[in-house]
Amino acid sequence: MFFLFHDRLKIKINMKILLVDGNEKEASDRYIKMGMDTQFEVYKKILKKKSKDSVKITLIHPAVQDEYLPAGVSLDDFDAVVWTGSLLNIYDHNKSIIKQIDLAKELLNRKNKIFGSCWGLQVLVTAAGGKVRKNPKGLEAILAKNINLSEQGIVHPMYKNKNKKQ
């Protein structure tokens, strides 16, 4: 997961990063409805914090928009690409997924450095010709409720401005 590896990211000053949101609009809307940040907002905050706001981030939503690159922008304009997580599954192969695989194929043929976690890895592996299979034991994601934060948890940035009891 991104949180486990973000301390190892090498982010340069004035780096141009393409942030690819892997979710469909409905999934992002669900995060917002629950009072959470969307996947792309979490990534954006981490990248800005890691770089001390010295990066230029361009956010795109290929699962939502047909024309997702801003006018006059090329994939070659970026030093790096960061691909977010998503509630999608690569083996479902719907239009949103196929568009993202096609984008990944384009990016793999360019000079960009690419970081993907969870969903981003599924897309990149598939685009590179690899196979991703469904876990026979079911979904590995876990939802936790009624969490009582320790003193360390209370001061952790992930829980900033949140209730002590989650």
What are these regions (language model features)?
Residues 86-90, 118, 122, 131-132, ...:
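Gly/Ser/Thr-rich beta-alpha loop segments that engage phosphate groups in nucleotides
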Residues 9-95, 99-102, 106-110:
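N-terminal beta1-alpha1 cap of cysteine-dependent amidohydrolase-like domains
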Residues 92-95, 126-128, 136:
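Short, conserved acidic/polar surface loops in the N-terminal third of protein domains
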Residues 129-166:
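Pocket-forming structural segment of enzyme catalytic cores
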Residues 108-128:
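Catalytic nucleophile loop
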Residues 21, 61-63, 118, 136, ...:
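Residues at the C-termini of beta-strands that transition into short coil/loop
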